[in-house]
Curated annotation (Swiss-Prot):
Alphabetical keyword list: Lipoyl
Function (record text): The glycine cleavage system catalyzes the degradation of glycine. The H protein shuttles the methylamine group of glycine from the P protein to the T protein.
Descriptive protein name: Glycine cleavage system H protein
Xref: Gene3D superfamilies: 2.40.50.100
Domain of life: Bacteria
Residues with the N6-lipoyllysine modification: 62
PROSITE patterns with a match to the protein in the record: BIOTINYL_LIPOYL, LIPOYL
Occurrences of domain Lipoyl-binding (ranges): 21-103
GO cellular component terms attached to this protein's record: cytosol; glycine cleavage complex
Cofactor annotation comment: Binds 1 lipoyl cofactor covalently.
An annotated GO BP: glycine decarboxylation via glycine cleavage system
InterPro entries, alphabetized: 2-oxoA_DH_lipoyl-BS, Biotin_lipoyl, GCV_H, GCV_H/Fam206, GCV_H_sub, Single_hybrid_motif
Native source species: Aliivibrio salmonicida (strain LFI1238) (Vibrio salmonicida (strain LFI1238))
Amino acid sequence: MEKDLKFTASHEWVRENGDGTVTVGISNHAQGLLGDVVFVDLPDVDDEVTAGENFSLVESVKAASDIYAPISGVIVEINEELEDSPELVNEEPYEGGWIARIKLSDDGDLENLIPGDQYLESIEEE
């Protein structure tokens, strides 16, 4: 796992891209709990998202799980590869399995996220 990632309590990860956007996906822990991912309901480009509200859905052989926006902003890109290869969420949760890129509407949202080392400690306690 990359050290620059930040997380939410609901297991989404965020990578700052350095251009006012962030890339969002679900953590390795989350994909492990879900099992084999068979479908990802992607948001639409230009959709506005609000921190804490669901913006995507990941379906696995075990369950369907809402994915919550870790920050508020506008979807600027979606990972269309997931339409044909949803298993990327399992195989490469921090690389090829990203879900969307979001243009931040409030940089302050990033301060509410959990640093990677603290996130790892929290899931070890579960």
